[in-house]
Regions:
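Phosphate-binding P-loop
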Residues: 1-3
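Hydrophobic anchor at the beta1->P-loop junction of P-loop NTPases
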Residues: 8
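P-loop (Walker A) phosphate-binding loop of NTP-binding proteins
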Residues: 11
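Conserved lysine of the Walker
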Residues: 16-17
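Post-Walker A helix-loop "phosphate-sensing" segment adjacent to the P-loop in P-loop NTPases
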Residues: 26-41
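Conserved P-loop NTPase "ATPase switch" module shared by AAA+ and STAND
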Residues: 63-85
């Protein structure tokens, strides 16, 4: 199976990390019900979630054909579209991703802050907007040109079983492939 890319965009505190976490966690749980363990490698600090493996470097990701999810929160911290020194390593990662059994999910404030080769290969874009009472999500399916809107109410139930540290600011992800 070739890799797939989901980009999630929204302003700070809009709910983009929440939907990324719930999407990946839901996929992981669906696989678990089928008897498949789906590892998640992420820069989200989730010490209470044993199924999420904290990584902060390309070298920490296994480059094999086993199914996996890579979730990078605030991707522009390390994958800036203007940082030309890192583009070679990011290009290698994208080429590797295309040949792997990997779902790559990332969040960003703005699409222009993300390297264009990642943007151009996205399969799904999720736009996030938040009010004091609701979070609005628009899922854009780039292969079909269709979209679906979801609105969720902000309440305690929405944040049940959410184990990442919402106050943790992701470090710059190291895109260099040393090995």
């Amino acid at each position: 199976m070739p890799g797939a890319i989901v980009g999630i965009y929204g302003v700070q505190r809009s709910g983009k990390t929440l939907i990324a976490y719930k999407l990946v966690k839901g996929l992981q749980q669906a696989c678990k019900q089928q008897g498949i363990f789906l590892p998640v490698y992420t820069n989200l600090y989730s010490p209470r979630d044993p199924d999420f493996r904290f990584v902060n470097s390309m070298d920490e990701l296994p480059l094999d054909l086993s199914p996996k999810v890579v979730l990078i929160d605030e991707i522009y911290n390390g994958c800036d579209a203007q940082d030309y020194r890192k583009l070679k390593d990011i290009s290698i990662f994208i080429n590797t991703l295309g040949k792997q059994n990997c779902l790559f999910v990332f969040t960003s404030i703005d699409a222009q802050m993300v390297y264009n080769r990642i943007r151009n290969q996205m399969n799904v874009v999720i736009l996030v907007k938040s009010s004091s009472t609701h979070i609005h999500y628009r899922f854009l399916y780039l292969n079909t040109g269709k979209y679906t809107d979801f609105v969720v109410e902000k309440n305690a139930a929405l944040f049940e079983d959410v184990y990442y540290d919402t106050n943790f600011i992701p470090l710059d992800f190291d895109w260099e492939m040393k090995s």
